[in-house]
Design a protein with these regions (language model features):
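Short, flexible loop/turn segments with low-complexity composition
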Residues: 87-88, 197-205
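GST-like fold's C-terminal all-alpha helical module
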Residues: 100-191
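Residue-level signal for nonpolar/aromatic packing positions in well-ordered secondary structure
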Residues: 22, 58, 71, 140, ...
Length: 215
């Protein structure tokens, strides 16, 4: 079985997270681009790979993984165990896994709904399990303050790739407020050469020409 790494991605999408981590790892990989505008993630051949019709999807030989947190956890464990992925016995392992999953289970939905007035189906029936944006960001800032600017073990890990990519995009679109701590976090991460390369590939400026960056 070949262990070739293939990343199925789309331009101007959240595929940048997995691509950034691959660049951090320095492992060889091949990109397979699917055009979202042309519906190429919904064609039958791609749906056999990812039944949700989404990107990114990672294939390592016959092993297929989708959803950014799962991809990040797998890649870091497989290619950077003990470095970008804290070891199982490392106290940082818990925060590392928590923040990696939190990025899409809490931060993404909370920030996507911020500012939208969605009425409950019944009076008193208002509840979202992922929480409200302000306390989520408060917790993130507290973790960064206590962790020396990073989320696990006081050092850069794949958790920062996962969370940092979400924060970077949400700051750009204005879906989260530009708090100084978060802006500094993104500035620090975006200075990394792996981030720059991934962003150049997956977030080309022309694709965002219609988006007015948040002040």
């Amino acid at each position: 079985m070949s262990d070739e790494i293939v990343l199925y991605r789309s331009v101007a999408s959240r595929s940048v997270t997995a691509l950034w981590l691959l660049e951090e790892l320095g492992v060889p990989y091949r990109l397979e681009t699917r055009d979202l505008k042309k519906g190429e993630t919904r064609d039958p051949a791609y749906l056999k790979i990812n039944p949700f019709g989404k990107v990114p999807t990672l294939a390592i030989g016959d092993q297929v993984t989708f959803e950014n947190p799962a991809i990040c956890l797998l890649l870091a464990d497989r290619y950077s165990y003990g470095a970008l992925a804290p070891k199982l016995e490392d106290p940082a392992r818990g925060p590392y896994m928590t923040w990696t999953v939190w990025a899409t289970s809490a931060l993404e939905p909370a920030s996507a709904l911020e500012g939208h007035d969605i009425p409950p189906k019944r009076p008193g029936d208002w509840h979202f399990g992922f929480g409200k944006l302000t306390p989520e960001l408060d917790a993130l800032e507290a973790a960064l303050a206590s962790g020396g600017g990073y989320l696990a073990g006081g050092r850069f890990t794949a958790a920062d790739v996962m969370v940092g990519s979400v924060v970077a995009l949400r700051l750009f679109t204005g879906q989260i407020p530009r708090r100084p701590t978060l802006a500094e976090y993104v500035d620090r991460l975006s200075a990394r050469s792996a981030f720059k390369h991934a962003a150049d590939i997956n977030w080309p400026p022309a694709e965002f020409a219609h988006v007015q960056p948040a002040p």
